[in-house]
């Protein structure tokens, strides 16, 4: 999109707001192009067990993340419309009264376009051991705020799941 991969574009939009980035990829997946302004604060990892989904990514990412970082963006890589302003909105809503802020579209909450307090993510390994695979399993007992896309830009939080959606995102 505009000459950049979706992950590269996502990282560029996120970069002004974060001290560190951890990118987790599936075993055998190509190493993404990391923007030069992020190279010194980006770590690459991979799923230590394949086909376990986002929870495995969380398990493998947390040890790579600086221990002082308490608020963690958890993002899917296929967000072609996302902006720095949207990430800032998520961050602004994350006040002391919430443990996570997730985006919501048509009453569907997206756990992979969200910001979490680190303790919310730490039980991921136990959930995998219990046979869970979905990040929503992390939510129980925590306080969540939901943030919907503005009416003037309803597409901002949409991800890409089909070749047709990808083609549309490139235009």
Located regions from the model:
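Nucleotide and nucleotide-moiety/phosphate-recognizing core
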Residues: 1-132, 140-156, 163-164
